[in-house]
Amino acid sequence: MPAIMEKNMLVSESLRTTELLGHVKPIDSVVTWSSPGSSRQAIGEAFKNTIEEIERAAVRGEPADSDAFFVADLNGVYRQLLRWHAKLPRVQPFYAVKCNPDPKVLALLNKFGTGFDCASKGELEQILGLGVSPDRIVYANPCKAITYVRYAASKGINLMTFDNADELYKVKQHHPNSRLLLRISTDDSNSLCRLSLKFGASLDDTGKLLDIAKSLELNVVGVSFHVGSGSYDPSAFLDAIQRSRQVFDQGLERGFNFDLLDIGGGFMNDSFDGVADLIRSALDTYFDPSIRVISEPGRFFVSSSFTLAVNVIAKRKLDDEEKVMYYVNDGVYGSLNCILFDHQHPVARVLKCGSRFVYNDLVGTGQHRCFIWGPTCDSLDVIANDAHLPYELNVGDWIYFEDAGAYTVAAASCFNGFKTSRIVYLDTDILD
């Protein structure tokens, strides 16, 4: 399908969806859309320009900031928003702030009326600071501190989740006017992060919890679930929607009038279209159109829109080893914490080798086997223990990692005195 035709189809569906959701600004009325191909070219130019400026500063004898850096394609976030509304027009996204709380990403999503999934007072404060209305926030943490519950009540943030009896008693005392979603457990055995190990009531317990909520005169308005962060099993959504239908029926039996279903997150970029088709069909089968449906996508919006560049700061060859060891200026204590916390496996690619920029070079992985270490003094700080690159690198060369927008900047630390990586933004005019 020609890119411009695909764009127009997405925009048409997005405009209809934003009208239904009451968004202030039509999605495509205020920005210039760019295709993925043009964005990739812009990313390459941003890498080249930034590195050349670093090198010019070094030649001038100025302190050169050769630290690792991201290139953030804001238009990429926007394209994913269009794609979401085209494939899941019934489902209003509430962006999972924990995934990447970058201020410009949040501002972009806020501009187009996206809701926000928050899990702490800090996230609530950040989103309210953007001028977001409290009714566009879901406090999606089933186990909240009392002080945080009080804060939510003071700010009019009413929609929140629970999965246990103690939370109900807590909410009754500190936020009795809340609108509650019962978080249920799911089969998330095929996800990167199995959230049901920690959260979610089983179907054996949901009826009891609804009885307690009824006795406390609390307003339970629906059901929420999460199939796990980074789910690779489309059938997990079908199973969770079927379970939600059972809990809706339990609520009806107890006199509740549920009108909201939160289908959580876990959406992967490469499997999204097929998963969305399944979700649309399941929602039509099990839930009347009058039921409002929201979701909590995170990585789907931001993962592919951030690319990380790291500099080779040291190189070590061992006589008895075939592999070369490279040491770079970001690692698992910084932007690549996703290796530990999100079970990701970033793929290293050569960005600059000697005087050659080779971004997006499709040479292949090559036969040069290597270790890639982060910069800290901890041996846990290993990015790859068997990477394959097409070229042997030297100190001063650059490597890049794509799909670096999810669970990277959010948890980066300054351990060992290393700074967090800066961000170079593309398409900032989209925020005007």
From Swiss-Prot:
Enzyme class comes to lyase
The reply on keyword Lipid metabolism is no
Q: Which Gene3D superfamilies match?
A: Alanine racemase, Lyase, Ornithine Decarboxylase, Chain A, domain 1
The biological pathway it contributes to is:
Amine and polyamine biosynthesis; putrescine biosynthesis via L-ornithine pathway; putrescine from L-ornithine: step 1/1
Q: Which domain of life is it from?
A: Eukaryota
| Cellular localization per UniProt | Cytoplasm
Quote the protein name from its UniProt record. Answer: Ornithine decarboxylase
The annotated site for Stacks against the aromatic ring of pyridoxal phosphate and stabilizes reaction intermediates falls at 226
PANTHER family, per the entry? ARGININE/DIAMINOPIMELATE/ORNITHINE DECARBOXYLASE (PTHR11482), ORNITHINE DECARBOXYLASE 1-RELATED (PTHR11482:SF6)
User: May I have one GO cellular component term?
Assistant: cytoplasm
This entry's Enzyme Commission designation comes to 4.1.1.17
Function noted in UniProt: Catalyzes the first and rate-limiting step of polyamine biosynthesis that converts ornithine into putrescine, which is the precursor for the polyamines, spermidine and spermine. Polyamines are essential for cell proliferation and are implicated in cellular processes, ranging from DNA replication to apoptosis.
Molecular-function GO terms, alphabetical: ornithine decarboxylase activity
- Active site residues of this protein: 377
Binding residues for substrate: 341-342, 378
Which keywords does UniProt give here? Cytoplasm, Decarboxylase, Lyase, Polyamine biosynthesis, Pyridoxal phosphate
GO BP annotations listed = pantothenate biosynthetic process; putrescine biosynthetic process from arginine, via ornithine
Reactions catalysed, semicolon-separated, are: L-ornithine + H(+) = putrescine + CO2
* Cofactor annotation: pyridoxal 5'-phosphate
Family named by the database record = Belongs to the Orn/Lys/Arg decarboxylase class-II family.
PROSITE patterns attached to this UniProt entry: ODR_DC_2_1
User: What does the annotation say about its assembly with partners?
Assistant: Homodimer. Only the dimer is catalytically active, as the active sites are constructed of residues from both monomers.
Q: InterPro entries, from UniProt?
A: Ala_racemase/Decarboxylase_C, De-COase2_C, De-COase2_N, De-COase2_pyr-phos_BS, Orn/DAP/Arg_de-COase, Orn_de-COase, PLP-binding_barrel
Carrying N6-(pyridoxal phosphate)lysine, the residues are: 98
Activity regulation (record text)? Inhibited by antizyme (AZ) OAZ1 in response to polyamine levels. AZ inhibits the assembly of the functional homodimer by binding to ODC monomers and targeting them for ubiquitin-independent proteolytic destruction by the 26S proteasome.
